Amino acid sequence: MEPLDTELCYDPDPSIVQPSCNGQTPPGHRTLSPTQQMDHEQQMKISESGQFSDVVENRGLLESSTRLKPHEAQNYRKKALWVSWLSIAITLILAIAAFTVSVMRYSASSFGFALDAVLDVLSSAIVLWRYSNAAAVHSAHREYMACCILGVIFLLSSICIVSKAIHDLSIRVMPEVDGFLFSVSILSGILCSLLAAIKFMLGKVLTSRALITDGFNSLVGGIMGFSILLSAEVYKHNSKVWYLDGSVGILIGLIIMSYGIKLLMDMVPRVRQTRHYEMFE
């Protein structure tokens, strides 16, 4: 009969921590160092976090549902509504002023900014719809629907901006800035940039692509406001660079078009995936 202190030692399974045999580590078993163990645990946590986010999204909810408490989510939702109403009021006034300048001065950048301001009004209205239902603050389907609508609006707006800029370049429209256009450009650049920063922050907290897209549109409006002044100032010092105003309009239009296409490519499949999870509608 074999002694009790002689135990069988099996070949170690790499995925299982093996106990010692007779107080000794089994041969062939490699012990991880503390640093390697920490790296392994960190990788496991990252993997579990990514899988959990996928599960949450597959249930028709945004990632914000796991980050925010109910009262916090409603608080940020109300802030998003207030910012959207403020954005609509400001950009609507700027759009009317920019359209007036565009007609009076034949400015492609002014027309482009006016169209972008109208786009900002529409995108903010979509964000209002997105967060109008208190129970749908974490609804992924509602979020993706809003993004798809924004993508279509971006495409239509970019076509108008590029067409107007090409037309003005073809007839050699010269950029001019008077006191009224200067005031509109400065105000639009500052206000739109501030609105963009606020929307970006709220969009990050609520994990809302629609709010971030609305912020991107406000940022574009601010850039276009400053670009009007830049093109006019360059033309004042060098009349040979008369085409800068129209070129900026084309560039902005192409950027908006690219963003709209990317948005639709990302969101259309997600709308289809979450159409069965309209539990909050």
From Swiss-Prot:
InterPro entries in alphabetical order: Cation_efflux_TMD_sf, Tmem163
Keywords from the UniProt entry: Cytoplasmic vesicle, Endosome, Membrane, Synapse, Transmembrane, Transmembrane helix, Zinc
Record region (Disordered): 16-44
Gene Ontology CC entries for this record: early endosome membrane; synaptic vesicle membrane
GO molecular function ontology, one term from the record: zinc ion binding
Extracellular topological domain residue ranges: 102-108, 167-179, 231-240
Membrane topology, from the record: Multi-pass membrane protein
Topological domain spans for side Cytoplasmic: 1-80, 130-145, 201-209, 262-281
Parts of the chain that traverse the membrane: 81-101, 109-129, 146-166, 180-200, 210-230, 241-261
Places the protein is found: Cytoplasmic vesicle, Secretory vesicle, Synaptic vesicle membrane; Early endosome membrane
Alphabetical list of PANTHER family matching this protein: TRANSMEMBRANE PROTEIN 163
Family per similarity comment: Belongs to the TMEM163 family.
Biological function: May bind zinc and other divalent cations and recruit them to vesicular organelles.
Full protein name: Transmembrane protein 163
Species in which this protein is naturally found: Xenopus laevis
Gene: tmem163
